Design a protein with these regions (language model features):
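Non-heme Fe(II)-dependent double-stranded beta-helix
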Residues: 1-13, 18-112, 117-120, 238, ...
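Non-heme Fe(II)/2-oxoglutarate
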Residues: 40-52, 155-161, 196-201, 205-268
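Short, charged/polar surface micro-motifs in flexible loops or helix N-caps
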Residues: 79, 89, 104-106, 136-138, ...
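Active-site region of the double-stranded beta-helix
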Residues: 90, 116, 131-142, 148-150
Length: 268
């Protein structure tokens, strides 16, 4: 149940943790889907840690295009309603899905970044629902957020997650993100201990990152489902990533299309 205080916290801080938003059945379905993807990775899979640190920081995206369980999570789980409520939007269109698995003993961090500068979309009503599939704390890579940073009014240059990917973002004329870790006391950094089925809902402009997984045996599997709301518009500007399937949208158009389906409200 989303409360008024949850919505107010999201608006103020840019992030909120919702407890047990996904029941045990959803957790088990998604864990099984993750293991299938790890065993037979999709065409967009990568190991973000490759070339920098030992371990495996597995990432994949667009799994909903070929896996029915990821598709069900994106379109039919509690996530669309959560996203619409938090965005204060009358509608929600599914944007894309992204999987992050930090295996034990993987020191590679998730760099501090905002999401929206990577994406060919503009607007305020853009959010992610990040579902925990394992117990998570800071030792195995809890996501950290700078509360209120979604309202700083600055777009930072996209930061590559993997060594050697810097060239992808050289077209961006945005300013580099500050060195947050050089003086963490300057910022209101938030993170949550999470249980499987908890989710984080966070604004596309909030500055966030995560440490590595320093544990010997605690995995950190997280599925992020991205949604856009009423005011979002397609914006394929230079320096953003391109989708593997080009959306049938003109620049400035609302996001709804076959690639970004309307998921809230549910069709009658």
């Amino acid at each position: 149940m989303i409360t008024h205080s949850d919505v107010a916290a999201y608006d103020r801080d840019g992030v909120v943790c919702l407890r047990q938003a996904f029941d045990a059945a959803w957790v088990e379905r998604l864990r099984a889907a993750v293991e299938r993807d790890l065993a037979a990775p999709g065409p967009h899979a990568t190991n973000f840690a490759e070339g920098s640190t030992p371990g495996r920081f597995f990432g994949d995206m667009y799994m909903w295009r070929y896996d029915p369980e990821f598709r069900a999570a994106a379109l039919d789980s509690p996530a669309p309603a959560i996203a619409a409520r938090m965005m204060d939007s009358g509608s929600a269109d599914f944007f894309y899905d992204q999987l992050f698995v930090k295996e034990p003993g993987t020191a590679h961090p998730t760099p501090w970044h905002q999401d929206q500068p990577y994406w060919p979309v503009k607007g305020w009503q853009i959010t992610s629902v990040w579902i925990a599939l394992d117990p998570i704390d800071r030792s195995n890579g809890a996501v950290e957020f700078i509360a209120g940073s979604h309202r700083w009014g600055v777009n930072y240059r996209p930061t590559p997650f993997r060594k050697g990917h810097e060239i992808k973002f050289t077209d961006s004329d945005l300013v580099p993100i500050p060195d947050i870790d050089a003086d963490r006391t300057k910022y209101d950094i938030r993170w949550w201990k999470m249980a499987p089925g908890d989710c984080l809902v966070f604004h596309a402009m909030i500055v966030h990152g995560a440490p590595g997984n320093d544990t010997a045996g605690a995995r950190r599997r997280g599925l992020s489902l991205r949604y856009t709301g009423d005011d979002a518009r397609y914006d394929p500007r230079p320096g953003t990533f391109q989708f593997p399937h080009k959306p049938d949208l003109a620049a400035g158009a609302p996001m709804t299309c076959d690639l970004f389906p309307r998921v809230w409200p549910k069709a009658a």
